[in-house]
């Protein structure tokens, strides 16, 4: 358990470096059979456009291999005399073009410097095309009480004020019906109304909006804001206007907008047509700006009860589906709604557009059903209890902010992966969609978005992360690495930034093959236990969603026992002799906390909350994702500065303040004595300045966490034995429970649970790992 306190030191290091890549294994076994014995899959967590000061910017287009299309990189063998280079992936010899004629061993182009394994190319702009501005269509739910709608409208006004002046803005409101507002019609408020109780096709949407083939007007001269065909400009003129031109109109429109006026019968839910509204927004963007970076930003305040995407009946006596209902197939609307949002996802991916979801309600709104559309398009998701809550307000503002805390929103991306012969790609877990590009490096077995070596990333930002799973195709007789000891992987991300520039980020990595049939000693030295824990969490979540009757706890336990049995050091049938190398010592406690986490123990949460947690787990980097699995705990006391503390109930003391970072929530917990002194006002007295500073330190640190994170976490400030202390206690190792309360020290605490403690878990693990 002492290793828990060492974790803070590990977090201080920049594990991802310039490349933004972390792997479960940094040394690879040579055969498929040996890879299967590694227990933890061969996987890489990649942050395709993560910012780093050492990444080289190159103002020209990259060179590609004529055979395999891999791009020129620092691992290519270059013959300067013959002016050619050998591709490390397929060994094909390529000639340099004439504009590379001046290169030499002392005059290398940036992509050939050995330290620049990641470079970013700024692709030359197309002179015939104006760089497209970013596009935002806001979709606002009006089936809310006036107070909630007021909060949402205020947030929208603030967001529009933060947009770049050239950003195009559209607006759709919905309740019982969906309303498309023609912002370009300045004489009066002009609205196109769509019935909310039935599905509308793309053609019906276009015809009703006057954008169909029968009603297309001639193009207006000189207007080409991202429109690919001339006729589309009329739709842009009418429904999508630059923020600078429509800010005043939208302000007036929002001021006049009221809660949905359709009468709601007593004991019934409002008639809310979320599905139709999103269909209409997608159809509008598809008609006006296909293939251009655009986002649908939906603010939803309750469950869809009308038309496609319905998740619950209007009768309030019917509860919204729970995990038990989904398990028993007793959620009558669920599968149909998922199928509908899957069709929206496919449409948006084909158009290159993003769906962002801000769901704010005490009830569920249907995040579980919409997950496929948000995740496939790389959209952002924020779940909160109210549009007046800081989780929504601060997160929504962050989405549009510039500067240091900007999310770095980018559009229209693709990811391609090249790898050495005999390495196969099984698939990707994360915010992307398969482009179904077949090839020799595509595996037969599929994990997540598979059967491809290229993916669409409609929306991505500086923190977007994807997990790529690999397999080996070789058998013992044709083992890779027999001739070449190095393997190579290349990740190519092409995307459009917020200014409309086209960029290509290229990361090329090498790792070493090792012969694990002889010894596993070297292999273990390349094990990244944090990455392995996160990959296991993502894989477990995927299996729980896709495999019927999957027992997550049992599968994780068996995996951990096999890993410890394979790589632990012990005498057969002697648990006391069991030890793990330093590269593995943290992994069992990560698995212990994963078993107890919201990703596995889903029955404490709603399906919406589980979908939300999993979407963020799948898109965040390893450092953030590991905090979701195993929160970090910091202790503050008079005797010392902030110190990393064990994630254990034993860390609670009457004279300490604890700061828990559980990613989705940040908890400041005051010990009993501290809270009593604070309530007596000691911190206001000059002679107790040290106490005032002690109270202030965790508050400042918690605010820093809140400022740096998206979505903004929930901040909980509580006292020992107070009602909200549960937010801390639920995350701590229950080493002291009501069963052994007599062993407690004064001022500490107990947890009322029958869950096993980490110590008991490790004892059982040792016993099972050493069995003959």
Curated annotation (Swiss-Prot):
GO MF terms listed in the record are: zinc ion binding
How does the protein's chain sit in the membrane according to the entry? Answer: Peripheral membrane protein
Which Pfam family, an example, fits this chain? Sec23_helical
Keyword annotations for this protein?
A: Cytoplasmic vesicle, Endoplasmic reticulum, ER-Golgi transport, Membrane, Metal-binding, Protein transport, Transport, Zinc
User: What Gene3D superfamilies has UniProt attached to this entry?
Assistant: beta-sandwich domain of Sec23/24, Sec23/Sec24 helical domain, Severin, von Willebrand factor, type A domain, Zn-finger domain of Sec23/24
Positions of the UniProt region annotated as Zinc finger-like: 65-90
Write down the CDD domains for this protein, in alphabetical order.
Answer: Sec23-like, Sec23_C
Q: Which InterPro entries match?
A: ADF-H/Gelsolin-like_dom_sf, Gelsolin-like_dom, Gelsolin-like_dom_sf, Sec23, Sec23/24_helical_dom, Sec23/24_helical_dom_sf, Sec23/24_trunk_dom, Sec23_24_beta_S
GO cellular component terms, alphabetically, are:
COPII vesicle coat; endoplasmic reticulum membrane
Could you provide one GO biological process annotation from this protein's UniProt record? intracellular protein transport
Q: Where in the cell is it found?
A: Cytoplasmic vesicle, COPII-coated vesicle membrane; Endoplasmic reticulum membrane; Membrane
UniProt function note: Component of the coat protein complex II (COPII) which promotes the formation of transport vesicles from the endoplasmic reticulum (ER). The coat has two main functions, the physical deformation of the endoplasmic reticulum membrane into vesicles and the selection of cargo molecules.
Quote the subunit structure annotation.
Component of the coat protein complex II (COPII), composed of at least five proteins: the Sec23/24 complex, the Sec13/31 complex and Sar1. Interacts with SEC24A.
> Which family, according to the similarity comment?
Belongs to the SEC23/SEC24 family. SEC23 subfamily.
**UniProt name for this protein:** Protein transport protein SEC23 F
- Organism source for this protein? Arabidopsis thaliana (Mouse-ear cress)
Gene behind the chain: SEC23F
């Amino acid at each position: 358990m002492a290793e828990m306190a060492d974790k803070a030191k590990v977090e201080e290091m920049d594990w991802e470096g310039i490349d933004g890549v972390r792997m479960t294994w940094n040394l690879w076994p040579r055969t498929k059979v040996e890879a299967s014995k590694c227990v933890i899959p061969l996987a890489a967590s990649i942050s395709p456009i993560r910012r780093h000061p050492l990444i080289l910017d190159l103002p020209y287009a990259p060179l590609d291999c004529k055979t395999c299309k891999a791009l020129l990189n620092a691992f290519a063998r270059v013959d300067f005399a013959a002016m050619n280079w050998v591709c490390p992936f397929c060994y094909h010899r390529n000639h340099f073009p004439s504009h590379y004629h001046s290169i030499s061993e002392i005059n290398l182009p940036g992509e050939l410097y050995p330290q620049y394994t990641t470079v970013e190319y700024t692709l030359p702009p197309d002179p015939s095309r104006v760089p497209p501005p970013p596009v935002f269509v806001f979709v606002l739910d009006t089936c809310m009480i006036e107070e909630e709608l007021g909060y949402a409208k205020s947030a929208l006004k603030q967001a529009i004020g933060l947009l770049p002046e050239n950003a195009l803005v559209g607006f759709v409101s919905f309740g019982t019906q969906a309303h498309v507002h023609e912002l370009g019609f300045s004489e009066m408020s002009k609205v196109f109304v769509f019935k909310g109780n039935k599905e509308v096709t793309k053609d019906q949407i276009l015809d009703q909006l006057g954008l169909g083939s029968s009603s297309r007007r001639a193009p207006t001269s000189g207007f080409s804001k991202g429109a690919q065909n001339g006729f589309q400009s009329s739709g842009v003129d009418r429904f999508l206007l630059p923020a600078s031109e429509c800010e005043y109109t939208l302000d007036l429109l929002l001021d006049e907008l009221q809660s949905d006026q359709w009468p709601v019968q007593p004991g019934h839910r409002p008639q809310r047509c979320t599905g139709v509204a999103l269909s209409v927004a997608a159809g509008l963007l598809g008609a006006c700006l296909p293939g251009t970076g655009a986002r649908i930003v939906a603010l939803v305040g309750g469950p869809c009860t009308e038309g496609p995407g319905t998740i619950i009946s209007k009768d309030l006596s019917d509860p919204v589906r729970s995990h038990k209902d989904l398990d028993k197939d007793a959620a009558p609307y669920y599968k149909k709604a998922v199928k509908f949002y899957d069709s929206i996802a496919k449409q948006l991916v084909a158009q290159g557009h993003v769906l962002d979801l801000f769901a704010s309600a005490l009830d569920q709104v249907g995040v579980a059903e919409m997950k496929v559309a948000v995740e496939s398009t790389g959209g952002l998701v924020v779940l909160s209890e109210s549009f007046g809550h800081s989780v929504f307000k601060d997160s929504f503002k962050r989405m549009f902010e510039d500067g240091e805390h900007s999310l770095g929103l980018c559009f229209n991306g693709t990811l391609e992966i090249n790898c050495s012969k005999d390495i196969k790609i099984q698939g990707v877990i994360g915010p992307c969609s398969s482009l179904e590009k077949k090839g020799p490096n595509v595996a037969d077995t599929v994990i997540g978005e598979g059967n491809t070596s290229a993916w669409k990333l409609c929306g991505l930002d500086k923190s977007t992360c994807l997990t790529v799973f690999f397999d080996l195709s070789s058998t013992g007789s044709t083992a890779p690495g027999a001739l070449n000891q190095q393997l190579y992987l290349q990740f190519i991300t092409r995307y459009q930034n917020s200014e409309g520039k086209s960029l290509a980020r290229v990361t090329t990595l090498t790792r070493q093959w090792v012969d694990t049939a002889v010894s596993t000693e070297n292999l273990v030295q390349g094990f990244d236990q944090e990455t392995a824990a996160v990959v296991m969490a993502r894989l477990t979540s995927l299996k729980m969603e896709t495999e019927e009757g999957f027992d997550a706890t049992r599968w994780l336990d068996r995996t951990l026992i096999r890993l410890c049995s394979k790589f632990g050091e012990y005498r057969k049938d002697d648990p006391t002799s069991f030890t793990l190398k330093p590269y593995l010592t943290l992994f069992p406690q990560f698995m212990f906390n994963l078993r107890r986490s919201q990703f596995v123990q889903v029955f404490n949460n709603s399906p919406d909350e589980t979908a939300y947690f999993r979407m963020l787990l799948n898109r965040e980097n390893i450092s953030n994702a590991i905090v979701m699995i195993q929160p970090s705990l910091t202790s503050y006391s008079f005797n010392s500065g902030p110190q990393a503390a064990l994630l254990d109930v034993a860390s609670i003391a009457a004279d300490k303040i604890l700061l828990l970072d559980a990613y989705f929530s940040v908890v400041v917990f005051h010990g009993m004595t501290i809270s009593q002194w604070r309530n007596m006002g000691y911190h206001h007295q000059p002679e107790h300045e040290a106490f005032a500073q002690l109270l202030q330190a965790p508050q400042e640190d918690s605010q820093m966490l809140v400022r740096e994170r998206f979505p903004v976490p929930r901040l909980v400030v509580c006292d020992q034995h107070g009602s909200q202390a549960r937010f801390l206690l639920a995350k701590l190792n229950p080493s002291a429970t009501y069963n052994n309360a007599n062993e407690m020290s004064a001022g500490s605490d107990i947890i009322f649970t029958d869950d096993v403690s980490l110590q008991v878990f490790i004892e059982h693990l040792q016993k099972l790992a050493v069995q003959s």
